[in-house]
């Protein structure tokens, strides 16, 4: 079961540009397009944000599922992350 802390370590290990994601943080625009994970409605929410507009939003009941979804999204630009999805 992956946690946000473990996800953060994986992304750091693979030098994923921090402008591509936001994990449990509320900060000004990170990048033009980025993936944001935060708590919402008793679970977790993952949003794709483009120019400060949410263009996609998914809700997950558990932390591990939300983390896996973030990895899947970031794997488009960082294919080495796919190893954590198997």
Residue map of PLM features:
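A short, charged, amphipathic alpha-helix used as a generic interaction element across diverse proteins
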Residues: 61-75
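Short aromatic-glycine-(Arg/Gly/Cys) micro-motifs in beta-strand/loop hairpins
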Residues: 28-55, 73
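Negatively charged, low-complexity tracts enriched in Asp/Glu with abundant Ser/Thr
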Residues: 1-29, 84
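Conserved aromatic
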Residues: 1, 60-61
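Short, intrinsically disordered/low-complexity patches at protein termini
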Residues: 42-43, 69-70, 79-81
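Intrinsically disordered, low-complexity charged/polar segments
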Residues: 76-86
């Amino acid at each position: 079961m992956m946690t946000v802390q473990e996800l953060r370590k994986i992304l750091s290990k693979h030098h994923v540009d921090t402008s591509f994601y936001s994990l449990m943080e509320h900060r000004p625009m990170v990048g033009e397009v980025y993936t944001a994970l935060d708590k919402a409605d008793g679970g977790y929410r993952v949003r794709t944000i483009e120019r400060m507009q949410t263009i996609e939003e998914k809700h997950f009941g558990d932390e591990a599922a939300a983390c896996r979804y973030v990895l899947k999204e970031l794997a488009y630009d960082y294919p080495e992350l796919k190893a954590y999805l198997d």
